[in-house]
From Swiss-Prot:
Location of this chain's protein in the cell: Cell inner membrane
Superkingdom as given in the UniProt entry: Bacteria
UniProt keyword list: Cell inner membrane, Cell membrane, Membrane
Name this protein carries in UniProt: Putative membrane protein insertion efficiency factor
Keyword Membrane tagged: yes
Membrane topology: Peripheral membrane protein
Chief site of localization: membrane
Function: Could be involved in insertion of integral membrane proteins into the membrane.
Family: Belongs to the UPF0161 family.
Xref: PANTHER family: MEMBRANE PROTEIN INSERTION EFFICIENCY FACTOR-RELATED
GO CC annotation, single: plasma membrane
Length: 84
């Protein structure tokens, strides 16, 4: 069953998709990571919600610079402590 998005999740992912469609092609491929920072941000928001997902995305974007080696950096899984 598909999980519905909150209005904030929808807004955040729509803004990121807008970046992917309109701005990223102009700038060209620059991300040092796999998945790219914008894909990472969308996945983090879907998995962790808007606030925590945006926090993960911001931390990831701050690491995306020439001095960082980059590489594979998947979204961390959701930690459901209440279900254990």
């Amino acid at each position: 069953m598909a999980q519905t998005q909150s209005p904030l999740q929808w807004l955040a992912t729509t803004l990121i998709r807008g970046y992917q469609i309109f701005i990223s092609p102009i700038l060209g491929p620059r991300c040092r990571f796999n998945p790219t920072c914008s894909h990472y941000a969308i996945e983090a928001i879907k998995v962790h919600g808007t606030a925590k997902g945006c926090w993960f995305a911001l931390k990831r974007i701050l690491k995306c610079h020439p001095l960082h080696p980059g590489g594979s950096d998947p979204v961390p899984p959701k930690n459901d402590r209440c279900n254990k």
